[in-house]
Amino acid sequence: MEDLLHSIEQKVKPLIGLGKVADYIPALANVDPNQFGIAIYSNNGELYHAGQAYTDFSIQSISKVFSLTLAIKHYGEDMWKRVGREPSGNPFNSLVQLEYEAGVPRNPFINAGALVISDMNQSRFASPHYAMREFIRRLADNPHLNSDQIVANSEYEFRARNASMAYLMKAFGNFENDVEDVLHSYFDNCAMRMNCVDLAKSFSFLANKGYSQLSGEQILSARETTQVNGLLATSGLYDEAGNFAYRVGLPGKSGVGGGIIAIVPNRFSVCVWSPELNKSGNSLAGMAALEALSESIGWSVFG
């Protein structure tokens, strides 16, 4: 497997230089684009990696999967009264659909949906970001994980669009807490710094019927795990979810920091990272690497 990952690394390296790092978050604009890492963590506890798999990066929207998992653990089916389960087809930070649909976001992985989930967690925990950080540390088996406050502060400074979504949802009665407090927690979560190995380990529970062998916890039930993977397959890659399903055929979630996680149910979790993004905000080399991996191993949730 490690030989395969090294060959994939060499295959996608020519793509580096053809994308663009996220520049709408100033603290992310300075990331060296000439980087690539990939890691796999199997249900047997085996770790394989290649490239810069131990280089930390900002997980950004990948954090939405952690937030959703916490909300499911504490709210169960009741949470779906406030957020939908349908693909959006619009950019991840769109306001148009949100107003048209009376302040109920299409799914938990667009920004509006993630803000509602953060609002729920704000109601549940006295210190939401602390609860999230400790949860992620357990899943990754890494007690040293933290947020990058420079990135979090940068995102908060340029919060206008996210704040607009939150206030719009509040106007429709779908936001309970102080908007600025929720935004701080939301950006702190997005600014968590992790690497490919951390993330592959963290999401191993989604490949293992909800059980994390690293923390020894049943994180979600087997049924809830299937449901989360279904949402990842339909809505995990912004408005490129269909293309990802076509090319890769696995549940996945991306972030504008250049990371993408993907799940091979009952087998392993994988994280790939390369900072340059395509026009949809997904890692250019990362998408190609996961497509090459899927082709090589012949595993897809679609048969």
UniProtKB/Swiss-Prot annotation:
Its EC number is 3.5.1.2. Substrate binds at S61, N111, E155, N162, Y186, Y238, V256. It catalyses: L-glutamine + H2O = L-glutamate + NH4(+). GO terms for molecular function: glutaminase activity. Signal peptide: none annotated. It is an enzyme of class 3 (hydrolase). Keywords: Hydrolase. Gene3D superfamilies: DD-peptidase/beta-lactamase superfamily. Transmembrane segments: none annotated. PANTHER family: GLUTAMINASE. Homotetramer. Belongs to the glutaminase family. NCBIfam families: Gln_ase, PRK00971.1-1, PRK00971.1-2. This is Glutaminase. It comes from Marinomonas sp. (strain MWYL1).
